[in-house]
Amino acid sequence: MAKIGSFIDNKYEILKKIGQGGMSVVYLAMDKRLNKQWAVKELQKYTKNANNEVVIQSAIAEANMIKKLDHPALPRIVDIIEEDKVIYVVMDYIEGETLEYVVNNQGAQSQDLVIDWAKQLTEVLHYLHTRTPAIIYRDMKPSNVMLKPDGNIKVIDFGIAREYKESNLNDTTYLGTRGYAAPEQFGGKGQTDARTDIYCLGMTLYHLITGKNPMEPPYEIYPIRYWNPSLSGGLENIIEKCV
């Protein structure tokens, strides 16, 4: 584990720990050359647990995937530093809160806000789907969308994203978040493609506009105007077409 005040690659000073998962620690760091703060994810390269090894390799693959992307709604990865026992991934430090935090604390969001977020999310999905090969995100949900202080969003956590391969017909065994994930993401009976992300987007918008978490009872999706008759019929149709 990196020490507070230490330097990584003689460039990034570790300021404080800002997050920790099972296989990684995230620090806030200062780039002394650019006078800019970055988030630095520390990954252990080796583990005695085979399952943990898979998680680590997935995180490394995620970093290499994001590093190739360039979109204002995606975090940038600016450096990947490999040392004897650890790998450091240097990326944008994103200020703000997740949309999950926002809806949990404020309830259903206004129609204007949700439409604005929907436009931003569809733009980033279009960007991903038009890469060569296309990138299928597979985990759109409020907790994976950061709302910045300026009102713009960032899509985070590419842990289960993949490059689309038409011949890969069985790629979907239990990947995704129940309530948001498309049916083909469970059971290994179908292939995920751009339509998978559209389904997840629809469920995300449903949660934001109704305040009803699809992961909680009644586990049934009603038209959004069932919950709020003043909402737009057009928005209701869009969400229903997504899912």
Model-derived features: positions:
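Conserved short submotifs of the Hanks-type protein kinase catalytic core
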Residues: D84-T98
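Activation segment signature within eukaryotic-like protein kinase domains
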Residues: W117-A118
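Protein kinase catalytic-loop region centered on the HRD/HxD motif
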Residues: T122-I135
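Protein kinase glycine-rich loop
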Residues: L15-G21, V26
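Activation-segment/catalytic-loop signature of the eukaryotic protein kinase fold
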Residues: I80
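C-terminal lobe helix-coil module of Hanks-type protein kinase domains
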Residues: G179-V243
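AlphaC helix of the eukaryotic protein kinase fold
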Residues: T47-K68
